Amino acid sequence: MAVHQQPATPFTLGTHLSEPTGAHASAYGTITRRTTGEPLGRTGTIHTPHGDIHTPAFIPVGTRATVKTLTPEQIRSTGAQAVLGNAYHLYLQPGADIVDEAGGIAEFMNWHGPTYTDSGGFQVLSLGSGFKKVLAAEFAGTDRDGEVRRGKERMANVDDEGVTFRSHLDGSRHRFTPEVSMQIQHQLGADIIFAFDELTTLLNSRGYQEEALERTRLWAERCLVEHSRLTVERAHRPPQALWGVIQGAQYEDLRRKACRDLQQLSLESEERGGVGSVSYTHLR
């Protein structure tokens, strides 16, 4: 993650959408940069309610609120500063409400440190549509934007409102929207959560990448609105910071557009007096 160039010590990371303000502001504090002499350096500190993260950081994946084969103490001994959980898997099993009742993902897994959760978008689309089969079909020269599983019912379908998918566990049907993703992630209670986005492959057409990029931008707007509402509604819980996702596949101009769009969304949110925001990376 890049930081934007400025002479002062504080800096902002390139994927923030929103950070708490007001009564919750002190829980996150200021992201500070270490003195390195490099304006685009990645060394700094992210302050969260459950501790600091010194970047660059080793953050292992604990998909179902556990890092396989390791206890929390063993995780810490590896030098890990935070753990990343998965909204999709925890929603399916054991359920976001159970994690919420336990006090959030950190309490649920007995991890005394910062936590992240992703939005579930990658898993909904990669597991729901058989991502490996997508790539295999595309490399074989089939229609890149066509049906993923020809002759079979697709397990994931994207529309402008969200994604309808079938569970990889039992085939049951579910629906994720930006609002649902925010609701699940607020129940999971991670310090840093991510906006819902659409997964594409590097072999999708340029036209589809542009369409998906715009859909992801609109979903980020909806995520920010719902995140703001839930932050007020759940003021008794520790605050959470919302980060955006930069898409655009292999197209640099699309990735730059994603950064600019999300930066603008952050600034607009701040002007509206919402939860608060910090700006995206300035691209040159």
PLM feature spans:
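Alpha/beta enzyme core
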Residues: 187, 218-242, 248-277
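Glycine- and acidic
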Residues: 201-206, 210, 243, 273-278
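Conserved small/polar residues in nucleotide/adenosyl-binding loops
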Residues: 281-284
